[in-house]
Amino acid sequence: MYYLIILVLLFLAELFYFRVADRCNIIDKPNERSSHTKVTLRGGGIIFYFGALAYFLTSDFEYPWFLLALTLVTFISFVDDIKSTGQMTRLLFHFSAMVMMFYQWGLFSLSWWWIVIALIVCTGIINAYNFMDGINGITGGYSLVILAALAYINKEVVTFVEADFIYTVICSVLVFCFFNFRKRAKCFAGDVGSVSIAFILLFLIGRLIIRTGDFSWIVLLSVYGVDSVLTIIHRLMLHENIGLPHRKHLYQIMANELKIPHIMVSSIYMAVQAIIIVGYIMCLGYGYWYLAGIILLLCFLYICFMKKYFGLHQST
């Protein structure tokens, strides 16, 4: 009953946001870099924040530093969806939020170099998640796969967080998917959505890694990770400014040049990541070997795909 109430309340909150976004003209207009062709409401992913907030309010205010950190990144990302903010301003908010999250993790009891590594990794993951949010269904669907895996791991493998937290966030993702995981999306996640869900997943995966002392759990983000990193390398090889928008991700070429429906592309990413996670859980004793093998396999598939189809992008 608790989750049904949460689901209904989040659904109503999303509908209320649509009215606000429509009235305030918070929209995403298509351009030459877009993978969509119609004006669509932006910022629907703000519901992820409200999912985390709902858990916080019903759990005797658990994880206060994390919630404060999430509030910071959600706020600056939402502002950025409305009007562009400076890069230094965003970095200040993000770094401040990450420091708070590290404190919630208990990371400051470790050596200082762990903090540096965590800052680099977390910044990279948040940016990657933001870059990968470009077609209908991909952010919500991919996040749903990871959250479902985390719920299973938390129950059957090792307990690293209260289960209600994961399930409440899943409710928010289901609400978003109802409006976004379709041919004609009612809304896009916006920076507020992609950044906030990335931050939530980082918090959960970070707790899992700290609890087990095993960094190979990062395999949960391997598909996004390989696509993002290799696309950056590819653009550097093409002497492009990697700070500018583009349409060179593998999923973008599938959707734009190969004309594969957005939902199909998103489903492929979901399925591949789900298969990888199942394989990892079956090979828990060989986590790092499995991670290395998966990265090599994904890199090989990425390179083969680009060799065959990138010419289509160059000709457009």
Can you annotate each of these PLM segments?
Residues 1-229:
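"…together with the soluble PPM/PP2C metallo-phosphatase catalytic core" -> "…together
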Residues 210-316:
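C-terminal membrane-associated helical module and adjoining short loops/tails
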